[in-house]
Amino acid sequence: MKKAIQFGAGNIGRGFIGGLLSKAGYHVVFADVNQEIIDKINEDKKYTNFVKDVESSEIVITDISGVNSTKPELIDEVKEAEIITTAVGVRILPIIAPSIAEGIKARKENGSEEYLNIIACENAVKASSQLKEAVYGNLNDEEKAYADKYVGFPDCSVDRIVPPVRLDNPIDVVVENYYEWNVEEASFKGAVPQIEGMNLADNLMAYIERKLFTLNTGHCITAYLGNYKGFKTIDESIADEEIFKTVKKAMQQSGMALVNKYGFDKDAHFKYIDKILNRFKNPYLVDDTARVGREPLRKLSATDRLTKPTMTALEYGLPVDALLAGMAAALKYDNAEDPQSVELQDKIKANGVKAALKEVSGITDEKILEDVVAIYEAM
């Protein structure tokens, strides 16, 4: 029996990667700290993905089990796995790394020569590489040499909107029809697993930045502008003509940065932008602006979805006014239930908008900082 472990039994884990692994013939073990969800997975041994779009459908995911990721039983699962995936949030990767390391140690002690590939499916650049660094921090030199030979950490980019919709069954999930999972082929160890829906890529960074600069950039700007105007959901926000125009323009500006950097076909990329805008309009996905906008400090950071495309566009001498409007809207994001939002607003109150933006984004270009402040103050 082929075994896969999916760290994170949340909406993305169940509604995207876990489902693809199950369809590919793996027994999928969901590892999570939420004992209630783990118990329900073990009780039902199946759940349903409700695909919500113009044409809706239901996909039943079977051959699953669950394990509490804080329990020693997890190590036994890692010992037997062929593939491990994660959907826990990039900040949690260092927390799960020791368990993965213990499993690798156990494989070495057992003399296992089976290959294991570990793919961190997170909204972050090179998340698997980050996880590898955290795992290797828990291994000695001999264990690292074993992992170098038998354990792969292919980086990937993932794209699927899975909103937190409450259903009668807590493990059922609502998902959009569209998804994309691009995985770096050269980093696999052993035979590359055959998983329908997993696209093997040789220039992964182009895919990662295409997704980051397009879906992630457009999504968060929609959320921040929508939140500023009092809208609660993404589809309500993008239906506002002014927001739609700003978001589309920002995505086209980040898109031109990609065209210049990677040689993407402009017409094809602009069609990709239109496809994503239509995904935002999907009325069947009730996606909160608070969810999409959460953690503004991370989203304003130098390598993330607002600052990175802006600075890349500037490298090529391209206009960035709509991207700067997105930054200004992020600085306006005030949500008492989001610790990063509270911290951001505290920084603004203490030091002013310009100093706060400079600190969180790493931007040193005075004109850009002043342009964002001007947009912020005009809002």
Segments (PLM) and residue ranges:
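Substrate/ligand-engaging "lid" and interaction regions
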Residues: 1-5, 11-379
